[in-house]
Amino acid sequence: LAEDGVIFVSIDDNEVFHLGLLMEQVFGAANFVATCIWQKRYSRESTSAIGDVHEYLLVYAISPVMFKEARNRLSLDEKSKKAYSNPNNDRRGPWQSISFTGAGYRPNQMYQIVAPNGNTHLPPEGRHWAMVENEYRKLEAAKRIWWGKDGNGVPRVIRYLSEVDGLVPWTWWPHEEVGHTDEARKEIQGIFGTQTAFDTPKPVRLIERILRIATQPGDIVLDFFAGSGTTAQALLNLNKEDGGDRRFILVSSTEATADAPDKNLCRDVCAE
């Protein structure tokens, strides 16, 4: 891996705990980044005592600090953009208010704030203001503090949509955003003419999510379990989208079949 490199490993409930121990042995606990949850089904699974509708993506980095600096934010989707509005016709555009407190106690961030209506405010128990007082005064002077529709609320910071450069990735990946197994099987059928060519296909959107987070336009991506070549397809899609020059290395232990008894090692990676 590169110094800012990262590895994503997909696994289900059967081996996730064994894999976690192995990953900690190889990479070390300090290099753990996250365990992402992929919602692989959109309908309830009723054959088990508790329905299985997700898989895991274990994420480790050579340097979590460097990966955090290098990783990309995700574009705001329409649902996220709807959280911003402009009820007061602010010339700076749509905005939303966000909390002005943080967890814990910080002595220099426990000052008293006087609201326009004369009410005084201190941080709630166990919390502190998000900024020191002089920084708060700058926001106040710029009319970046929101006191609620009637002016009787607690101080909140106004954040404009134009200032948001994307969403920090989080660990919950719902099927609406990254696809599900049925979608993956349909993609397989579109290429190979059958949905049974591979047992555990991944939707292209899932791999695209990983690549959007973890890669830059000139990076090399290695997939040890290439399967149907979904990683290659997702990478080429992303290159087409942003003009990047990402390259891939795919590794697969191709199983012998009636059509390929010699276990061909090389095949075309492009499909129309």
Language-model-detected regions and their locations in the chain:
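Beta-strand segments within the central parallel beta-sheet cores of soluble alpha/beta enzyme folds
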Residues: 34-37, 226, 247-250
